[in-house]
Amino acid sequence: VGQNPPNGAIVYYWLKEPVKKVTIEFRDSTGRTVRSFSSDTAGMGAAGAAAGGRRAVAADAPPTNKIGLNTFSWNLREGDATTFPGMIMWAGVTTGPLVLPGNYSVRLYVDGQQAAEQKLLVKKDPRSDATGADLVAQYKLLMAVRDRTTDANDAVRTVRNVRGQAVGAKDKLGTDSAQYAKLVDELNQKISAQEAEIYQVKNQSGQDPLNYPIKVNNQIAALAGVVGSTEARPTKQAQAVFDMLTKELEGYLVELRKVYKDLLPSIDDLRKKHNLPPIEVKPNTVITP
């Protein structure tokens, strides 16, 4: 049985000799880099699958660097929202939105040097009645949904990174260990409470959301499947739900910033006393591009 051709923009390139690294870069008409893929990059796919949507939805495999003819397929999507290990969502979409119809370019870099550039035209689906303004409105909301999903997931990643740094030093402060442990326990209690509002921490398997209600990161991510289900202007209801969830998320983020500001200085003072570095308030290792 034959295979269907890949969706999206297909790039063919010929390598006449072995190379270490191939990079394929897509840019829009303003020169902005939309996506960049390298042969030494793993895990290009998103954790969430799109629930419908126009044009391609499959994740992109990294480009190859073999001698001879190589083929790469870009799924015509912007970068994905970040994820974290073990994240479970119910109908949540972390896949980036499809780009707008228009002029793009693709560049091929071989071992860091630009080797070729070609123009690329992304056309609107001829079956769609959506206007250009409709597609722009849809794209803007989908990008906002993706960015807020990243904000929510990065907050969880930051909580887990801060917790790991703080708890990991409990037995390294000698006579100050008891005082340090008390401060860390308070920190952990407060940031864990906010983490549990952003993400359903009880989820351990794909069916767990049936028993435990989804939280704000999943609710925001699920909007992408609704808004991107067809080529059309987003409904007023979709925008209203997004605004409501964004406000809810911001409340949790504000509280987390307050906890870090209030508790970390005392914790870091004790760490400094014992030649330990201050706790870094940032997400742990990035999982998706």
Across the structure, where does each feature detected by a protein language model lie?
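Contiguous beta-strand segments within globular domains
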Residues: V1-T23, R27, T71-S73, L142, ...
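Beta-strand-rich binding/interaction modules
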Residues: V11-Y12, V19-F37, N103-L108
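Conserved structural-core and active-site-/substrate-pathway-adjacent residues in large, well-folded domains
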Residues: Y13, W74, Y104, L270-R271
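Short acidic/polar inter-strand loop motif in beta-rich domains
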Residues: D80-F84, Y109-Q118
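Low-complexity, Pro/Ser/Thr- and charge-rich linker/hinge segments at domain boundaries
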Residues: E117-D151
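Mature extracytoplasmic or organellar-lumen-exposed domains after removal of signal/transit peptides
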Residues: Q118-L120, D151-P289
